[in-house]
């Protein structure tokens, strides 16, 4: 392993601390809690939407979340290991066949829906036991 990769790994470990990073994939509906500083106040703002892309590049990993807010589409890019992200919660798993869902930008309404991924009984049993 080269020196840069080693340093990136240490930095990821420092940024995540003891909390593991939530596993999610494109097509999943997630709620990203973001720390927002307004003057002297610090609050947590939730951004809920569909993950349309995920970029796995070590420390530079990022993902794009798309939501429809009062009829207008909003896309926001988040750095995965950013200190501004308080938490990432997966609300629903999506069943998609693509890694990048940019085609959703051209669709609206029912055509932009994503099927829910059904978990098999065997996988469910392993998770519980």
UniProtKB/Swiss-Prot annotation:
Keyword Cell division in record: no
InterPro entries xrefs: Ribosomal_bL19, Ribosomal_bL19_CS, Ribosomal_bL19_sf, Translation_prot_SH3-like_sf
Gene3D superfamilies: 2.30.30.790
Gene Ontology terms describing biological process: translation
Entry GO CC: cytosolic large ribosomal subunit
GO molecular function: structural constituent of ribosome
Record's keyword terms, sorted: Ribonucleoprotein, Ribosomal protein
Pfam families: Ribosomal_L19 (PF01245)
Similarity remark: Belongs to the bacterial ribosomal protein bL19 family.
Function, in words: This protein is located at the 30S-50S ribosomal subunit interface and may play a role in the structure and function of the aminoacyl-tRNA binding site.
The protein's name in its UniProt record: Large ribosomal subunit protein bL19
